[in-house]
Amino acid sequence: KSFSDNIYRNINGATLQPVLDTLITLKQSGVWLEVTNLLIPTINDDMQMIRQMCRWLVDNGMTDNPLHFSRFFPMYKMRNLYPTPLDTLLQARETAIEEGIKYVYIGNTSDTRGEDTYCPHCSELLIKRDYHQVKINKIAGTGLCPKCGTEITGKW
């Protein structure tokens, strides 16, 4: 929920390093890995922190692993906050792409701009989603871009 150890400790009551170590262990073990980051306004939605997290993912060989930015809604102990603005999610997505993450998605929103999968080589639309439904899947069964042949990492 944060790339800051202080924030992670305050929100989760735990430290960040074991999470990072686990991500590295899973990656090295060949386990399919996707990272989800719930963006909480005023807590962990700082673009510098998001950029730092993305750089860590890139530096640790996770450019092909999907990164999901999820929208926060006020509940339980955080009812005083507001929902994550859509612009924040889109900016986080763009930041991650700029840093080299190939598959970046936004979720927990009805906006579909950050749901689709594109080929990182030729930008061909590969998977078209509408909220939680797949409308088009051009790589099912092959894991290859039909336009340029690039292998798309994942479980197909």
Where are these regions (language model features)?
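Short, non-ligating residues that shape and space the ligands of small metal-coordination modules
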Residues: 128-129, 154-155
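Conserved AdoMet/S-adenosylmethionine-binding subsite of the radical SAM
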Residues: 1-84
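Short alpha-helix
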Residues: 86-96
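Residues immediately within or flanking Cys/His clusters that coordinate Zn2+
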Residues: 116-117, 142
